[in-house]
């Protein structure tokens, strides 16, 4: 009896916009985790949908009191996060973000409950899927060295692959420290994750599948990167990261998004950081692949090192 592990409470944040076709699957995935629903709150924010997304949510909310629906004017993903933060909607120990077309895996909360050791930020693994079959597992755990826990992170130690929020859990107190995100723009999830990471005192990596990421849904932001405006938005995010001296995540995003990289080459855009990109926190295979891609794709040409200027002024995220 004395050794029984007390159960953590969880908040699931779901931004929703015109996803009536998919949101039922998201809601049911939370219900079907097998975790005590009294210890879960599912915060669903309808970001000005013009379809019947809210009607679908209301039907579930009548049956399941852990579901909380909020409606607001459209301001995109960043606007939803600002709304949740500024209205203090999170009440539980840990929170995670599950977009309305994505899903939580079974037993995900039990796994976090087992492995969390009062860490501020927890990274899990996730599946990329097409809505029917699981495409392939993404083992985030293996992007890092064998150590499970990192404490007191320094800017230069931020690992390369931290720009996806799937399977990521964070303390509510950490979430409330994040500055407002930019509204009406795509790709604010990567910026938010940088904020979380920089403010976390303890980060844990759990080699468990915690989410399903519907990466091939039509009009998914990851599928419209070839759109010129999307390229410019992502470029703006990278320039913001450069201000905070985050060369490694910038490098991995440039490696991953070919169109963005070519745009930077064409327009002679370079990123100035006091440190050069490195992949030292990844395991050997990932580290070798990243270095190879970094030079083979010419990404190394997009960086210019700046000298460190002594200043007492603190940069606030």
What are these regions (language model features)?
Residues 148-227:
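Conserved nucleotide-sugar donor-binding catalytic segment
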Residues 72-90:
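Glycine-rich, basic loop-to-helix element that forms the pyrophosphate-binding segment
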Residues 211-217, 222-250, 260-280:
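Catalytic core of nucleotide-sugar-dependent glycosyltransferases
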Residues 29, 46-55, 99:
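A conserved acidic beta->alpha catalytic loop
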Residues 95:
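Short aromatic/hydrophobic "clamp" motif used to bind/position activated sugar donors
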Residues 107-137:
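Conserved donor NDP-sugar-binding/catalytic core segment of glycosyltransferases
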Residues 19-33:
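Short, well-formed alpha-helical segments that are part of the catalytic scaffolds
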